[in-house]
């Protein structure tokens, strides 16, 4: 109790996203805010389909909160305890309700707890916006470039927040975990880096589509993978299927997220395969040594890096499933394969 009393009010408040149920509640809040501003500031013709796609995604996450989690269960439990221990006035003599249970020891009394998780959540949830813009246009077989403008603008915000979140997370790991470095290629670190790489690739390739009418199909694929990678990242972080110092598993969220990831992936593939032919007449890149060629090389490197990191992250899971033995992929794998690609990228 003494430790809890000394916790700063900030850390008590930040316990909202320190728990599983609270973090999903925060996800729903961010998604609702993003949806409001998207529909308010992007006056898109026939936006009913955008609303339906948003609603479908929102129902999925709200569904977990409604049917499988109870973010206020602790408050209710403490209230009941308070009533039982009160004499004349309910809650006056409670010994827990004013203190709470406190966050995980790794999360206690650190200022970055107030910044790092929300930054990542805003970055993750924000990837829904370009996905909605691209999917609705593809579904309507709209061959105009309106969607790429919307998708590009709505990618900048989550990309920026992901950048801040990843940077702060690296600093936090260096200070708290004490492994002598800012980045250890931990699975949870990897799954936050993958959508950042894909979003960076899209922000480059979208400019090529606007200027030369190429890479239409590729941009749709990137936008879809950006969104799916955020669901995958949340699955890895919250399910505990992979060994990570950052993973906090609890309840049946892993199964629920895996189900959602499967459904969203199948819908993405189905809609794309049914309608992608309407976007297959884009022009071809002719000058590979010009701006377009370098942007394509940039995309190849970024996507390849994301793919290598994804394979290295999930390989232990498949290995354990097949051979019933746990393994980990060391940093040498990433340093050898990803390191040179990122160095080439810096040269571009």
Role assignments for model-derived ranges:
Residues 43-93, 128-164:
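Carboxylate/His-rich catalytic cores and anion/metal-binding grooves
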Residues 243, 247-348:
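Long hydrophobic segments that form regular secondary structure
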Residues 168-190, 240-247:
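Interfacial helix-loop-helix junctions of multi-pass membrane proteins
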Residues 37-59, 139-160, 208-224, 249-256, ...:
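Membrane-interfacial loop-to-helix junctions in multi-pass inner-membrane proteins
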Residues 1-4, 8, 12:
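Single conserved hydrophobic/aromatic residue that forms the stacking wall/gate
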Residues 5, 67-80, 89, 175, ...:
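Membrane-helix interface motif
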Residues 22-35, 120-134, 191-206, 256-277, ...:
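Hydrophobic cores of alpha-helical transmembrane segments in multi-pass inner/ER membrane proteins
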Residues 19-74, 107, 114, 121-125:
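Mature extracytoplasmic enzyme cores
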């Amino acid at each position: 109790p003494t430790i809890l009393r000394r916790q700063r009010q900030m850390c008590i408040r930040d316990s909202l996203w320190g728990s599983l149920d609270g973090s999903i509640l925060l996800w729903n809040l961010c998604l609702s805010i993003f949806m409001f501003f998207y529909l308010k500031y992007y006056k898109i013709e026939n936006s009913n389909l955008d609303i339906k796609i948003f609603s479908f995604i929102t129902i999925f996450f709200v569904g977990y909160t409604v049917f499988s989690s109870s973010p206020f269960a602790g408050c209710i439990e403490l209230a009941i305890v308070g009533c039982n221990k009160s004499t004349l006035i309910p809650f006056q003599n409670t010994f827990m309700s004013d203190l709470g249970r406190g966050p995980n020891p790794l999360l206690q009394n650190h200022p970055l707890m107030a910044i790092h998780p929300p930054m990542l959540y805003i970055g993750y949830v924000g990837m829904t916006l370009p996905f909605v813009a691209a999917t609705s246009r593809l579904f309507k077989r709209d061959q105009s470039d309106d969607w790429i403008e919307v998708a590009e603008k709505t990618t900048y915000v989550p990309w920026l927040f992901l950048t801040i979140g990843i940077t702060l997370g690296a600093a936090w790991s260096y200070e708290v975990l004490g492994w002598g470095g800012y980045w250890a290629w931990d699975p949870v670190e990897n799954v936050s880096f993958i959508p950042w790489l894909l979003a960076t690739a899209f922000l480059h390739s979208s400019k090529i589509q606007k200027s030369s009418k190429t890479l239409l199909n590729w941009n749709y694929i990137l936008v879809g993978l950006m969104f799916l990678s955020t669901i995958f990242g949340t699955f890895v972080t919250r399910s505990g299927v992979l060994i990570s110092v950052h993973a906090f598993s609890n309840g049946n969220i892993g199964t629920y997220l895996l189900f959602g990831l499967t459904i969203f992936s199948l819908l993405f593939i189905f809609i794309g395969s049914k309608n992608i032919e309407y976007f297959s007449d884009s022009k071809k890149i002719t000058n590979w040594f010009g701006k377009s060629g370098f942007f394509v090389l940039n995309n190849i490197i970024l996507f390849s890096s994301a793919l290598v990191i994804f394979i290295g992250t999930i390989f232990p899971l498949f290995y354990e499933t097949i051979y019933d033995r746990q393994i980990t992929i060391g940093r040498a794998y990433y340093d050898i394969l990803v390191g040179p690609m990122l160095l080439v990228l810096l040269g571009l």
